[in-house]
Amino acid sequence: MAVGGGALIVDIRPEYQRRADGDIPGAIVIERNHLEWRLHPTSAGRIPEAIDARVRWVVICDEGYASSLAAATLRDIGLTAATDVVGGFRAWRAARLPIARRVKPTPPRLAPSRR
């Protein structure tokens, strides 16, 4: 998701949290343990958006703690425009910003018997 100034939102929450709480429409989903590998522009495993070190990454987690550490690590490896959402997804939700809810699958059930 591109936000003001062309920044891109990266959601590092685990799958179970995104499933339970919803997704941020347009956010790039990269779980925390893959973040540096996927965003560094010289990495063989980089995503297409990771074109150079000047990309403005906005990292979001659930409460803002993991994203603060992740953004600091990104800055440490040269991605100097990286930052995070203070308060994380909880603050995002409290601000009533867009959230995409997943449709829960209907569990299978037995068909009525025919006699």
Question: Which residues make up each language-model segment?
Answer:
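Short, surface-exposed ligand- or partner-binding patches at beta-edge/loop junctions that are enriched
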Residues: 60
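Rhodanese-like catalytic fold shared by cysteine-dependent sulfurtransferases
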Residues: 1-8, 12-56, 65-115
